[in-house]
Amino acid sequence: MKIFYLVVLAVCSYLFGNINFAKIISKSKKDDITKHGSGNPGTLNMLRTFGFKWAIFNMTLEILKGVVPTLVAKLVFKDMGLSQIAVYVAGVSVILGHIFPVFSKFKGGKGVAAFAGFSFVALPWWVALIILVCCFTFVVITSIGSIGTLGFVLISTTIQLIRINPSNHGWLCYIALGFVTTLIMYVHRGNIKRLFAGKENPTNIRAAFKKDFKLGKSKDSEVQELKENPGVKLDGDVNNSEIKDVKIMGIESTAEHVDKIDEQ
């Protein structure tokens, strides 16, 4: 009967993981995140496409998506003596649901935010928070998003390996954790190749923050700079190929056009 309950937990967590907030948010804006940038419906692509505010909102929801099923599993299965294995069953399942959603033809995101949510339950929450803040700060400083995200996964995995109780279905937890960590690395294989080739796409959080909160140049000044220098790179995020698609010459009211420039 306990195995049956764990199977039900796995199925429910997987289906819960099918919810992709990046797609929901972009559709609410009458757009499709999968048609922008890397095409990945995740936080980094949301940052490049819709800006800092929407990226943080999306990341928060995705982390909560990882927290909810794992926390419920921990509490519900505690009296059965299965809280540890239940956390890993729920965590792996929700991440699988995010990466391979059945309702989106098994084409989803890369699972890092959901893994972060799972880590908030598998580890003491303050430990996961410290790791998250450190990795986020690293991305802000370096603008290399993939190192920050993969760094979080590897650091969290290492600490979890130390904390898992071997006497409480520990070998199953080790297998589950090793599997999901390897899977996340695999779906990031393109990012890893670009990192070694020095061609990884930048993740300029500072520029996105300044743009959202209007701490840098005004839109009018950016438009004027684009008019005078069609090949200029603004705030480190707008590239030449994007500028070619924006017909601003001779148009006085251009703020709307600048909003539609996709940040890569």
Across the structure, where does each feature detected by a protein language model lie?
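Short, non-helical or kinked segments that cap or interrupt transmembrane helices
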Residues: 32-43, 102-116, 144-155
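C-terminal ends of transmembrane helices
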Residues: 22-25, 95-107, 134-142, 189-193
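Alpha-helical transmembrane segments in multi-pass membrane proteins
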Residues: 9, 13-14, 18, 22, ...
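Helix-coil boundary and interhelical linker segments in multi-pass alpha-helical membrane proteins
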Residues: 1-8, 70-89, 120-127, 161-176
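Interfacial segments of multi-pass membrane proteins
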Residues: 47-50, 73-76, 93, 111-142, ...
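Long, low-complexity, intrinsically disordered cytosolic termini of multi-pass membrane proteins
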Residues: 213-264
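Cytosolic, membrane-interface loops and tails of multi-pass inner-membrane proteins
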Residues: 23-55, 108, 193-216
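Loop-to-transmembrane alpha-helix initiation sites
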Residues: 127-131, 145-152, 168-180
